[in-house]
Amino acid sequence: MIRILVLCSGNAARSQIAEGLFRAHGQGTVEIHSAGTQPAGFVHPLAIRTMLERGIDISQQKSKSLRYYENQRFDYVITVCDDAQLECPLFPGAYEQLHWSTPDPSFFPGPESEQLDAFRRTIDSLSSHILRLLEQLKNKKAASQ
């Protein structure tokens, strides 16, 4: 099984959304984890709410520190914020590192309706990246058989 770690700074919104999307779209083909370089200690309520709109429940996910994963092996390490890309440590073994620069929706100013739209845009953006990667993985697997 392909092991993937998604990193952002707080592990409260973007990487949590990505973890939930990988679980939903990967349908058991990937082992997905997320972490933060400076974990917030919670999953953002608007991330939970907007993912539920898509039928994906991330309410039981936990905000985790990158340190928990430091000596583990992954096939892919994906950073979804520029700070995490700069702070991303080296992991053991061979892996592919991807960077999907994604603005933090939790910093979007304005009324809640506009904040919700920012979270929805984040979900759409990450979903596009994730579906593309999953398709590439599927094609690689088919080509190797």
Which ranges hold each PLM region?
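Residues at the C-termini of beta-strands that transition into short coil/loop
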Residues: 36, 81, 101-103
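Short glycine-rich anion-binding loops that position phosphate/pyrophosphate groups of nucleotides
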Residues: 10-12, 82-85
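Alpha-helix C-terminal capping/helix-to-coil transition sites in glycosyltransferase folds
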Residues: 71-73
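Phosphate-binding/catalytic loops
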Residues: 85-145
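Short, Lys/Arg-enriched charge-dense amphipathic segments
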Residues: 55-61, 83-92
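Generic alpha-helical hydrophobic packing signal
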Residues: 17, 26, 30, 58, ...
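Conserved active-site segments centered on acidic
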Residues: 1-68
